[in-house]
Amino acid sequence: MAETTVKKLADIVGTPVEKLLTQMKDAGLPHGDASEVVSDEQKQQLLAHLRKSHGAEDEGSGKKITLKRKSTSTIKTTGAAGKSKTVNVEVRKKRTYMKRDVVEAEEREEAERLAAEEAARIAEEEKRAAQEAAKRAADDEAARLKEDEARAKAEQERKAAGEKAAEEKSKRVSVPKVSATKKPAKEETPEEKAKREEAERKQREADEAKRKQEAEARKKAEEEAARRTAEEAARIAAELEQRGEQEEKKPAVEDDKGSSIVNAAQEASYQREERQSRRRRRKPKVAGVVHGKMKSSMNKQHGFKTPTEKKIYEVEVPETITVGDLAQRMNIKAKSLIKSLMKMGEMATVNQPIDQETAFLLVEEMGHKPVASKGQEELLEDHLAADLVTRDSVDSEHRAPVVTIMGHVDHGKTSLLDYIRKAKVASGEAGGITQHIGAYHVEHEKGMITFLDTPGHAAFTAMRARGAKATDIVVIVVAADDGVMPQTEEAINHAKASGAPIIIAVNKIDKEQADPDRVRNELATKDVIPEEWGGEYQFINVSAHSGEGVDDLLDAILLQSELLELQAQASGSATGVVIESRIEKGRGTVASILVQGGELQIGDMLLAGAHFGRVRAMVDENGKAIKKAGPSIPVEVLGLNGAPEAGEQIQVVTDERKAREVAEFRQERDRELKLKRQQASKLENLFENMGSAETKTVNIVLKTDVRGSLEALTSALNDLGTDEVKVNLVSSGVGAINESDVNLAMTSEGVLLGFNVRADSKAKRVCEQEGIDLRYYSVIYELIDDVKQAMSGLLAPEKREEILGVAQVRDVFRSSKFGAVAGCMVVEGTLYRNRPIRVLRDDVVVFEGELESLRRFKDDVPEVRNGMECGIAVKSYNDVKEGDKIEVFEVKEVARFL
């Protein structure tokens, strides 16, 4: 046999020589050159190493080998143009070899296992059959003994009754002569009675011994059958093992033989059991005769007894439940439950949800016991709370204070924050006003401070309330030249409601009109007393323009935070609050989050209200990417599946499935609440509009840049509605205006409004084609004013009466053509012919109509001025008297405005 070198082995295997040498070196072989010889043992060692490195087991080496062969040849073919070309042909072959003893051993082991299982099953079947037969025999014996005892007792009672009857008869017949000839009845002597009882006892003992012998014989037969079955199974297994070494072609023959033996034994056992049960089968025995009718000894075990008492259930009632589910829990039909609801004055369908209180009343009405239970959402919320408890076990550390800047619009909140941050932010806000919460953290020489800048406009009340809720310290900015304004009072109320400490920053003290004492006096009337006056509020004079007093303000903030002793967990699952959220093209949902505890990292599963998602990226307020954020750090998070509401609590959960379930339940809950509100408003509107004219509506499709602005605009627009004109928000959302928004506006005949967003190319094209009114806004004042103007256009005009002139009747003439004609003097204004008139008598209106004729002398004139005489004929009125006044007026329609 030719020797195999490393190079030849590489050609056979199809591997480069360098790679094969590396693998041989890893396997511990001494080969370093391609010309060295490789033995069979070394090949096996290399193969075992490769199998082990690729995940195969060591014990499998040597049992199975796969060989590949590749040969390359060339053939010449003629193409379509008659030219010949050479084609390379590559033939690949693959064969797998296994040792025969491995296959035989596996087949032998499988056959032995099957035979043992079959034998065990047969033994179990025979044992169970023997036990059942013994049980049936014992039952038959007990029934027989009971029957014998009953028969003997009945016989004794019959004899006793006969003896008693004979004795009474003998007493009644008392003839002395005849009694000498009569033979007395033969009575059983005590000796005979004792002999009879002894014979019966011996018979019972013999029967008992016989029954015990039969039971022992059955037990021995059962053990013998099990032993024979085990011996047969062992014999079959040994025979299979002996034949497995010789037989190679059909290993299944032993299996067939073994299974046939087992099947035959099993069939014989079944036939024997069937014969025994057939012999023991008896007809129902007669227990006695009652009034000439036979009474069966069989018990009526399957007799149905009608329930006489009503079953009372304990019905678990969650917070909301549908009528159908409640009926199913009480085991009644839904129709009866709907009838009970109608009696209570509430109309409902089978699938309509009802609240827990109504369900309690219904359950008590139906006679059952209601029990309050937690819904699935509450259970999930409890699991999340348990996760928070485990996180709270981490030691707390000192954290930076969260400071909210609040105050009236244009009082310099953002400018003050700009000076602290040394950046210009207010210039980027439209109209120079802040329209959503900005979050920033500032590194001061004495510590870090996180600032929240809230809008000062009245429409952002809810946003300011959220800012006060998430804060530790509130800084209220008041302009020294403007004093306390409405939003200043509102900010003070929000801060007091949240319980956060308040610091008053009196801004713009560098102006000539500045009067800090006036601010102190005005705030003192609002129960905000300065410290220097004996109160508890710090007043700091600052100037956002020159920077005067800014350091004092920061020192006051840090001093107040030290008094509060703010603590938070620096590690563990993060919790916080959503400051703002928006949808950006190319980035998706972007949520501004203030971390309040724990550590938020990239890759965490975040649950925010009814939305969830994995954190894909985080950036700080400067746009710089970060990987983690600790307590009191504001960040922007990417990865949520939707834009959450501002103010929603966020929490990091470990399980994505749990986060999805909680988010879906919260969405379903919000949808049900929304439907309930809509249904209630529809019913209210139905009764309000009954008998009145139809209310006009302004349909609006609104898109904004962030959630906070959307909420503020929605609240402001809903407040604009009146009894005559209402605002109907057909759709509202966050993000750019797309084609579906345009189609919605076109269908509802509404106006499309964009606040700090723009429409894409498709939406613009559809707007131009269909003539949809599309408007862009960057300041909230302008949007609200335009909507007011549109609503004013739908208002019915106001009708106003204007008196044009008054004439006094001096005399009354009769005319064949007009009847009574009043000769009048114009005492006020001008009289016009084609105008409505009123006839006043003693300054009381007695007639209202129109002029039929207006003449001066004998000429018809269109008008008569003040101080002139004229003749007036009133149409359809002839009761004009001297001294009356004729008033000419005009009705004008005046446009109304909200």
UniProtKB/Swiss-Prot annotation:
Bias (Basic and acidic residues): 114-171, 184-258
Region of interest (G4), residue spans: 507-510
A single GO molecular function term of this UniProt record: GTPase activity
Presence of the UniProt keyword Transferase in the record: no
Binding-site list for GTP: 407-414, 453-457, 507-510
Disulfide bonds: none
A Pfam family matched in the record: GTP_EFTU
Chief location: cytoplasm
UniProt keyword terms in alphabetical order: Cytoplasm, GTP-binding, Initiation factor, Nucleotide-binding, Protein biosynthesis
Ranges annotated as spanning the membrane: none
Domain (tr-type G) ranges: 398-567
G2: annotated span: 432-436
Subcellular location: Cytoplasm
CDD domains: IF2_eIF5B (cd01887), IF2_mtIF2_II (cd03702), mtIF2_IVc (cd03692)
G1: region residues: 407-414
Chain intervals for the UniProt region annotation (G5): 543-545
Domain of life: Bacteria
InterPro entries membership: DNA-bd_dom_put_sf, EF-G-like_DII, IF2_assoc_dom_bac, IF2_II, IF2_N, P-loop_NTPase, Small_GTP-bd, T_Tr_GTP-bd_dom
Gene Ontology CC terms, in alphabetical order: cytosol
Presence of the UniProt keyword Acyltransferase in the record: no
Residue ranges of the region described as Disordered: 51-70, 114-303
G3, as annotated region: 453-456
Role played: One of the essential components for the initiation of protein synthesis. Protects formylmethionyl-tRNA from spontaneous hydrolysis and promotes its binding to the 30S ribosomal subunits. Also involved in the hydrolysis of GTP during the formation of the 70S ribosomal complex.
Record-stated family: Belongs to the TRAFAC class translation factor GTPase superfamily. Classic translation factor GTPase family. IF-2 subfamily.
Full protein name: Translation initiation factor IF-2
Organism: Alcanivorax borkumensis (strain ATCC 700651 / DSM 11573 / NCIMB 13689 / SK2)
